[in-house]
């Protein structure tokens, strides 16, 4: 590991000289990429320096205790050695984690899709609750979000909603939210007070730039129509809604929230690029295709990654066996105690 870290230190020094002279780069994109690499290596070198310092302090402590004759002072040194050994172990674990090459998608913005699955109106209402949960979380991180497409129910729920979240490390934080979310609660329409179980699916896609996904104009069929609201009633007198069909893959995206056809088409293209990228990436990586299928599935209640139990104020993530009895806070966006263990488990599985 030390040999690898010394090689990376040489790369970091070279990169440090390069980023100080932006004129050497052929494009803004290449400069951004090098800055991202420099930031990663800087974090790694900072931890490596901490590791080396702790290692030297531990060596000095071992030498000191051999030369010391005072029993009380020896006890003090032994305690210091135990503290330094623990710090060295922690630093070593951090280095192993940091040595995992960063995912190029880590810093991407996302397109998030939430759909009501099993449970009818109650599933649609919970889909709306999840949307609010994620937007509260985004606000707490000072991220921005924008609704791209939504299909509402007459009770105020969402059959489905598609929205973007943009900011620092968005995809890296929220990528593990993909999957089936199960809710157990008494619906407001339930007179007998029985607990119902419903399911909602969440898909998280990295938002791709136009230059990153090749979609030819002739491969996209554009249909325009009048926007519709809950129950199917017409809510617009002009053909502002847009449906894009990607002919090679059959992917269909509909956007109708904006009054402008041009704006709806632009939003639909953002979603289409991300869906096409996700499909192509799944084909290239069979393992990822299997993971995505197991996460998203059909929305059936038997396929779940997380359960929200309202009567017990409990939320359980079944992948990392995390159970919290503060569902009320989670639904207001307090997700860090769930998201952080997922990120840690993912990194540790690669080490």
Curated annotation (Swiss-Prot):
Keyword Hydrolase: no
Matching InterPro entries: PCRF, Pep_chain_release_fac_I, Pep_chain_release_fac_I_sf, Prokaryotic/Mito_RF, RF-1
Record localization: Cytoplasm
Superkingdom of the organism of origin: Bacteria
GO molecular function, one term: translation release factor activity, codon specific
PROSITE patterns named in the record: RF_PROK_I (PS00745)
Sequence similarity: Belongs to the prokaryotic/mitochondrial release factor family.
Name of the featured protein: Peptide chain release factor 1
Gene of this entry: prfA
């Amino acid at each position: 590991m030390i040999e690898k870290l010394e090689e990376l230190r040489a790369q970091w020094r070279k990169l440090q000289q390069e980023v100080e002279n932006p004129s050497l780069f052929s494009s803004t994109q290449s400069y951004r990429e090098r800055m991202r690499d420099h930031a990663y290596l800087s974090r790694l070198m900072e931890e490596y320096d901490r590791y080396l310092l702790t290692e030297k302090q531990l060596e000095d402590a071992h030498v000191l205790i051999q030369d010391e004759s005072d029993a009380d002072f020896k006890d003090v040194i032994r305690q210091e050695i135990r503290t330094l050994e623990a710090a060295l172990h922690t630093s070593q674990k951090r280095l192993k984690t940091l040595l995992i090459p960063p995912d190029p998608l880590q810093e991407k913005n996302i397109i998030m899709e939430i759909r009501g699955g099993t449970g009818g109106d109650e599933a649609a209402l919970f889909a709306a609750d999840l949307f609010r949960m994620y937007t509260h979380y985004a606000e707490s991180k000072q991220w921005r979000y924008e609704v791209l497409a939504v299909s509402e129910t007459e009770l105020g729920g969402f059959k489905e909603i598609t929205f973007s979240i943009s900011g620092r490390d968005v995809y890296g934080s929220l990528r593990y939210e993909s999957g089936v979310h199960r809710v157990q609660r008494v619906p407001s329409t339930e007179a007998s007070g029985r607990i119902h179980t419903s399911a909602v699916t969440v898909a998280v896609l990295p938002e791709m730039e136009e230059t990153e996904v090749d979609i030819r104009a002739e491969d996209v069929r554009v249909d325009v129509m009048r926007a519709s609201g809950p129950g199917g009633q017409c809510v617009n007198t002009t053909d502002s809604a847009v449906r894009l069909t990607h002919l090679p893959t059959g992917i269909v995206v509909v956007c109708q929230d904006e009054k402008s056809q041009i704006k709806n088409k632009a939003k639909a293209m953002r979603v289409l690029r991300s869906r096409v990228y996700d499909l192509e990436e799944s084909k290239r990586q069979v393992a990822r295709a299997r993971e995505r299928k197991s996460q998203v599935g059909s929305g059936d209640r038997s396929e779940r990654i997380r359960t929200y139990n309202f009567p017990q104020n409990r939320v359980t993530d079944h992948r990392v066996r995390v159970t919290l009895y503060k569902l009320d806070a989670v639904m207001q966006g307090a997700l860090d105690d769930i998201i952080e263990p997922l990120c840690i488990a993912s990194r540790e599985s690669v080490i």
